[in-house]
Amino acid sequence: MDSFKVVLEGPAPWGFRLQGGKDFNVPLSISRLTPGGKAAQAGVAVGDWVLSIDGENAGGLTHIEAQNKIRACGERLSLSLSRAQPAQSKPQKVQTPDKQPLRPLVPDASKQRLMEDTEDWRPRPGTGQSRSFRILAHLTGTEFMQDPDEEHLKKSSQVPRTEAPTPASATPQEPWPGPTTPSPTSRPPWAVDPAFAERYAPDKTSTVLTRHTQPATPTPMQNRTSIVQAAAGGGHGGGGGSNGKTPVCHQCHKVIRGRYLVALGRAYHPEEFVCSQCGKVLEEGGFFEEKGAIFCPPCYDVRYAPSCAKCKKKITGEVMHALKTTWHVHCFTCAACKAPIRNRAFYMEEGAPYCEPDYEKMFGTKCRGCDFKIDAGDRFLEALGFSWHDTCFVCAICQINLEGKTFYSKKDKPLCKSHAFSHV
């Protein structure tokens, strides 16, 4: 095997077509050349194996990855190729008897048909792809050369075969040797390369890293759906490339050639997947679906966003849920310090919200007995001009509870009847 490097100057087309790839368990190779194209002028031949593309090893690339790698080389394409040595045929000795009548080498018509059929079995260089594979390459738009029309292919393939009549000799004729062994360039790679099975084992995988732009963070309580952008494949009406059918745009009902978007189970041309209200193309970012219509985030917020209970305007950003309604964050604030309450605790006093520190400062009450705050829901009583927890209003000497009982007071401290005249 001879390895060599070829550099093609851009722009595309480069004048060749690839076949194989890791996903086909077949090494990448040149399957067809454009006559007079850039690849043909650089000495590339049909059957050459592709070792690297622009310096990257091609052994771990799938068919689509290799094509994308070639597309990325805009003005300069560097390929490392490998070519098998052609087999040298041995010269055959031909006897030329004189003055003998000529007769065909094949004695009867049945052997003649057998030879013709056998000729058809020979592998033809450059046609290793199946018809379905070529159709897939045509649908996906991943070809690197312009195909000649079918009539030209048929004319170029119909090369007349002529057999030189072999004169009969007195010596016995040698038996027909059978079809010629194909050259190494047309033999399958698993028969030529002993390391093929190990290199393309099924358990070996390749990883593709792609950059993806995340849509904006969705508004709380809303459901955003992101766009799934697919490479060109197959799919009828949005099925994609899994069922092998050509995708049809849901908007214009035309067959899609090239890139397309899949959203809500339907396929679209990228330029026809637009907002129903403003007409903005939604190829990048998120979108909303409401009653069968598609909206961009700004239009959806304006049309379907909730209203603020204070200013009555649409809430297009962060939503504050409080008191069984919705608010702008800057509209639901403390009545004292005017700071947004957000997710903090708050208290209502005379219909206005207060944050916890301001409420305690303005309306908070402390127990005279324990000096702790009397929270909402706590049982308390008013006595001696102060507020008391019901469990804290006790005799200052014997600690008996005085709630609902007669008591005496000395130095603002409650005393029971037994200790009314005791020293405090």
From Swiss-Prot:
Gene this protein is translated from: PDLIM7
Lineage: Eukaryota, Metazoa, Chordata, Craniata, Vertebrata
Role summary: May function as a scaffold on which the coordinated assembly of proteins can occur. May play a role as an adapter that, via its PDZ domain, localizes LIM-binding proteins to actin filaments of both skeletal muscle and nonmuscle tissues. Involved in both of the two fundamental mechanisms of bone formation, direct bone formation (e.g. embryonic flat bones mandible and cranium), and endochondral bone formation (e.g. embryonic long bone development). Plays a role during fracture repair. Involved in BMP6 signaling pathway.
Polar residues: compositionally biased ranges: 81-98, 204-221
Domain LIM zinc-binding positions: 247-305, 306-365, 366-424
Modified positions (Phosphothreonine) in chain numbering: 96
Region: Disordered, residue numbers: 81-221
Bias kind Basic and acidic residues: ranges: 110-123
Source organism of the structure: Bos taurus
Domain-level remarks: The LIM zinc-binding 2 (LIM 2) interacts with TBX4.
Protein name according to UniProt: PDZ and LIM domain protein 7
PTM sites of type Phosphoserine: 78
Gene Ontology molecular function, alphabetical: actin binding; metal ion binding; muscle alpha-actinin binding
Compositional bias ranges of the Pro residues kind: 174-187
PDZ domain sequence ranges: 1-85
